[in-house]
Amino acid sequence: MPDLLASYVAGNWYTAPDEGAVVLDAATGDAVARVSTTDLDTRAMVDHARRVGGPALRRLTFQERAAALRELATALDANKAAYHELSLATGATRRDSTGDIDGGIGTTFVFSSRAKRELPDGYLLADGDVEPIGKGGAFVGQHVYTSLPGVALQVNAFNFPVWGMLEKLAPAVLAGVPTIVKPATQTAYLTAAVMRDIIASGALPEGAVQFVCGGAGDLLDHLGGEDVIAFTGSASTAAVLRGNAAVTTRAARFNAETDSLNCSILGPDAVAGTPEFDLYVKEIVREITTKAGQRCTCIRRALVPASVVDDVIAGVSARLDKVVVGNPRNDTVTMGALVSLHQRNEVRNAVAALQRAAKVVYGDPTSVELVDADAEHGAFMAPVLLLCADNERSEPNEVEAFGPVTTLIPYSAPDDVGVLAARGRGSLVGSIVSYDPDFVGAMVSSAAPHHGRLLILDRDCAAESTGHGTPMPQLVHGGPGRAGGGEELGGMRAVRHFMQRTALQGSPAVIARLVGGS
């Protein structure tokens, strides 16, 4: 029987008294770990964060917190080879894991470096300029940010067990707010391995971070207006959390990043044979095969001119023919497994729902050729490309198949594209692939209000582009509407989400003394 993963509670590792739930290897079906939070004292966790972790972090200046983050990232970087080995059990290939593991550690380094450059060596963060209020200049105002005295609870998704934790932890540490990490059960064993190294590093003060390995229990019952809930996952779970009394009655801050029917738009100028057409086809294939399509930023709707639909299908199909699906431990494999058999069933059901409006033009959602694996025990699925010839159908704008699946949707006139993009009702990211500046300008104007991020991809930037689906720590990640209405990352913007903005009023000398010593 595999080990029962421990939670880190009030300075001690806690192992539940029962057998817990078994977590399986996504590729082989073998048991990897067990998880349980039976009898976990969640009140003690929140109290410890507020009374021990928070004060300890707030005794550090912004610069000292930045140094602690660098020490932490350095320690994790030294151990990342072990994380990569463990990550294979999640179904991810080694290349997939780079985005999660190296990306998470790299994000921590970026936050440390940006903080060293941009934040003061103090405890108070000025926001904007001094505002003259009195006629004689003796009375002024100044907005400032200070650390929230509560706790940040992060509830994370299964697809990024390392990056998902670190990209939330880093800005919270800089803000001086302690964190409780609650990973998704399916991949909690990888988060747990990283968490043990975080604690062992000693880079953060005691109480700055705690860990719940299993269900959250009644943790939200102890949160209120001084606290932050940072969630990544499904829209349905976000709705449940958003409706909790911690948010609705006690006004805890709630930030959500949820499902997203992201689109990629091919411009009318990007016909077969142009660099932009080739870039578009390559991007589609990369998006639906990276992490087996299990990224919240994955392209779900491919909006293409009706005149090039057949060319796009041919181009995507030719590239997908080269994809090797199977056990990620085999170096010839280029696409691994979905996270679980349950997740594969969910994706197949979603594809069936999409097939009410679309037809499969590549792949078979129920059958796949595998290397070093079998589809009975491993959660494997072939890449699937669908075509929804009638762009008035609602299904592609409502159903997300969270796997290696995307749907082609044709458009006849450029004026239609903005309307089609908006039907996703809010997305994390969209991309525009075109070399026509007029088309790009029109698309940005119409699509930007519905997206948290827009990639404009063409031959001039392709060599350095980080791609449609990769959030960068310097840029905001999140989106309106269906995408959750939240925002994270974006450099030092992320730090302010864990702080309180207050307007100070007083004499210029007092305000200057307060802010100047920040």
Where are these regions (language model features)?
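ALDH superfamily catalytic-core signature
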Residues: A75, D197-G202, E226-V228, T237-N391, ...
